[in-house]
Amino acid sequence: MIYKVFYQEKADEVPVREKTDSLYIEGVSERDVRTKLKDQKYNIEFVQPVDGAFLEYEKQSENFKVLEL
């Protein structure tokens, strides 16, 4: 399944909505995704599963690229 991860680039700073980035990653569960990203030092705010019509909508974005770790 593909997940959309909302994160802050620096884990040691207070989260600010305007600085939130997102990425897409494939995993079997939210825990699996968080485990794959733990070495990136991101401040992960939210992990959202993406499927069905929502996935098709996200694929239309020019920024849609599934991160492979």
UniProtKB/Swiss-Prot annotation:
Function as written in the Swiss-Prot or TrEMBL entry: A non-essential component of RNA polymerase (RNAP).
Family: Belongs to the RNA polymerase subunit epsilon family.
Membrane-traversing stretches: none
Keywords per UniProt: DNA-directed RNA polymerase, Nucleotidyltransferase, Transcription, Transferase
GO process terms (BP): DNA-templated transcription
Molecular function GO terms recorded: DNA binding; DNA-directed RNA polymerase activity
EC number: 2.7.7.6
Pfam families named among the record's database cross-references: RpoY
Reactions catalysed: RNA(n) + a ribonucleoside 5'-triphosphate = RNA(n+1) + diphosphate
GO cellular component: DNA-directed RNA polymerase complex
Name of the featured protein: DNA-directed RNA polymerase subunit epsilon
Subunit structure as annotated in this protein's UniProt entry: RNAP is composed of a core of 2 alpha, a beta and a beta' subunit. The core is associated with a delta subunit, and at least one of epsilon or omega. When a sigma factor is associated with the core the holoenzyme is formed, which can initiate transcription.
Organism of origin: Bacillus velezensis (strain DSM 23117 / BGSC 10A6 / LMG 26770 / FZB42) (Bacillus amyloliquefaciens subsp. plantarum)
